[in-house]
Amino acid sequence: MIFQASFYKSKKLLLIEDCEPVRASIKGMLQQIGFDDITAVADAMQAVSPAKRHSFDFILADFNLGDGKDALQLFNELSALGAIKTACCFVLMSTEPQRLPVFGVLQGTPDHFVLKPFSYVELEKRLAKAWQNRTALRKVYQAIKQTDLASALLELDEAIKAGSANALQALRLKGELLLAQGEYNAAAQLYSKIQQQRDFSWARLGAAVTMVKLQQWADAEQALLQLAEQDDIRPEAVEWLARCYLLQADLVKAQEQLTELLKLQPTHIAAHYALADVLQLNGQQEDSSRYLQKLIQQFRFSAFDAPECYLQLSRVLLEQAQHAELGAFTAALKKSSEALASMPQKLTTDVIEPELAVLRARISLLQGNVADAKQQLNLITVATKPVHVAAEQDKARLAFALGDTKQAEAHLAVLKSADFAADDLSGCCQRLLAKQAVLRETELRAQLRDLNQAGMDAVQKGNVKVALVKLRQAFLLMPCNAGLALNLLQVLSQLPAHKALLPLAKAVLSALENTSVTSANQQRLAQLLPQLPELYLD
């Protein structure tokens, strides 16, 4: 053994293995090595709680963890939660060779890999090697954790100059640190120098990423397309191609690369969300709706189940309902409500609940419950920065629909000034969605004026049915605009009573009842009410 049993006796280890007999066997090996403090769990979901509670020195995880997240996804989740301490060694094990990420060591990657079956001697060698590597660069990792990148670079330069066994890892870290600091030219020079000595895949990818950062789009595309032909680096290259195209707003090519990425990594959740966003950005609402429904069915009640799918599906269905014909409106609106209701209770966190409440209020308003929607609007605060573009747009839409254009503009101002600096898939999509949201809200106001004008022109020409279609569309965009509501009420008073029009008439009357109206509008309402069919006034 490389280390004595006494070394391991003081260390805490988390073992994650879904097969009970294998888990027991590996635990026995670990005890033979010298570990006393061993926490053994069966899957990724069971691992999160102890990882958050305890400060483990080692995490030993099987790559394939049944139906839930694999070990790499668990590693990313625990890293995001801050549940992996700086000195912790994360070691993967599998019956088949697994490709570890070649880029992203700055954000963190597993320390080592051990191929099953193994003896306790082989396992100890891997654990010891991981510990030695992590310890040798502990000052670097500590500085990175404290976001002291300048100190981290100094420590890396020392390790590289010393020519230690960890010099290669130090070079990888240095390249990514330079990129993180915005030192793109320095990073390009470093990767070029490394490639002159040896053709490492990670260095070639680092050079291509540097081209993306420098917005050298043609060179970046060519380099990434070449890397995408290499098996050992294909997923990372394809993902960076998708990012490259998203940064240029080339949605067609981005969609192609995201589709290819998901063939390579079917549980790449960020890629799934990005593809759904791209479909929305492309105006493919039906495709976006179907894709979100597919994701919900595929991952429901699994470790990948997430509230974003339910929220976004509800938004897409709500927009479809607003454009539905009169006869299909109620059923379409019900689908939006059902999408929210289908979200498992465990996903309704304190962060998600405000988003849910705003969406429910938007749906409730279109059902004619103006007072409830206004009550929710009073609880909304304008964020200093958006947590999520769609959530901020929901607030703007609700405020606008209720006639509070000042608050609506405040939410749009947040989107206009938002700085989505991250160039990961989510950050790229959020940046594009924010631009589209601001543009669409501006178009919405122009559309509202056009619909109202077209409706009143149709009234003057005696084409009441056309007027109904136009003014109803305008009303659904802004129910609490007294002028619009009165125009629609005028049309309803000129049409024969019909049960199909009853919900619309009730919604218009409810909106007028809960909206401030001028004295002139009050007089107009008083004139119109006697002209309405009794069916609508019961």
Residue spans for each PLM region:
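Conserved phosphotransfer microenvironments
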Residues: 60-80, 86, 494, 501
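C-terminal output helix
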Residues: 118-127
